[in-house]
Structures are given as C-alpha cells and as structure tokens.
Amino acid sequence: MQGSRVVTQRGTVAIEELQLGDEVQTIENGNLHMTTFLGWIHKEADHNEQFLKLKTESTQITLSKKHVIFYKPKGRERDAMTTTFADLVEEGDLLKVILNGEVLWERVVDVDRETRKGIYTPLTSAGTILVDNVLASCYADFLFQFVVTSIYYSIPLPQSKSVSQADMAFLPVRLFPWLLDNEESQVKDGLRFYPQLLTWFGTQINMVESYKEESNLITATVSFPLAMLVMGIALRLSF
C-alpha cells in the first residue's frame, strides 16, 4: 500500500516510488538478497481499500486481505515456512523479518484493519520483497485461484508450491520485462496487460474443471499451446 517502505540501491523509499530496474531487498535462502523490480502487477494510486496491518514485535506490514505472505502457524514453529493470505494470519503466528541486519522469525502481536488509499503490487525477479522489513510474496489471490491452480494443475495445491507456480507463470516477464511494464506504462493505474491475460487463461481452464476425470489430460493438452497463444498476443500488442 501507499507509504510502505522498501530498501533499494538508492536507499529506503516509499513503495510507490519504485522505478523500473531498481534493486530491491528481499530474503533468499535465509539471507538478505537484492532482486530487480520488474514493474507493477497492479497499481491503483487513488483507490481506497481495506487493508490488514500485521504488527510484530519490532515492525508491522500493511497489505491487502488476499495478499500472499510467508509465515509459520502458531504452535508449528519447527515446521518449514509456508504461505497464506494476509487475512488468515492470527496473533501468535510467525512472520519472517529483518532486524538490525539479521533474518529472524517474529510473532504477530496484533492484527488490525484500516481503510487506506493506494494499491501497489510490485513484481520482482525473485517473486518476493521485503516491505517494512517483513518478507512478502509479490502475488495475490487472483493469481492463486485463476492462474496457479487452473493452468498448471487441475487440483488445489499447497500454497507454498503455488508460489513457485506463480513464478513460472511470470517467467516470460522475467525474460522480457517489457511484457509487464515500461517507462511510459509504469505511471498508469490498473491491472497490467500480462496478468490480465493470465487471469483470462485461468478462467478458460476453470470452465472444464467439472470434467474431473479428463481435466488432467485437458490441462496438459491445452496449457502449452494456449501459453504460446498468450505470448504471441502479448508480443504482438507490445510493438
């Protein structure tokens, strides 16, 4: 959301001030890492939205209810990190944070709701980003529901696996960042063209999910040529 802070090679900036090509701080393999900002998946500077504020022992992150965040459920501290939607995080759950240069887990001590202005969903080459010193993914519910599950699998996936599938869905953007954003489009509001195509793609496959016995075959049969069609349209319209 507007006003959230991220660390770049230019220093700490508000998330809405990110520029194409910025190197942004994230956590990868348990260590601090810089990742490239590729553009906006979704941006609505003047839109009022209800956000969740997740407060930990040292910091807080404010994000949309269906944004995907990394966590460990309360009472399962020894389990591997997984993901969930922000509105499912509860007091006592653990979030991954950076504190004084150290990567650690902190408990959520308060969950609050507030209406604020500005939606900003950045995409980085890592698919993750540190926002206000808390690790979050770059993805929200529409990617999980329509793209990840529908395109790559015909059955629901654990969300931790869905993150890597969302990364796969955006592989063309990582290879050709101009498919998502450019210097002219980055200042404009709205859901970007490429994720719109992914959403449409997912809804088409959702239409055949009622054929449970055939859906795996259908998905395998149509996903590759449809992906090529989507890429072709995107490439065509980008010139």
What would you call each of these model-derived segments?
Residues M1-F239:
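HINT superfamily self-processing domains
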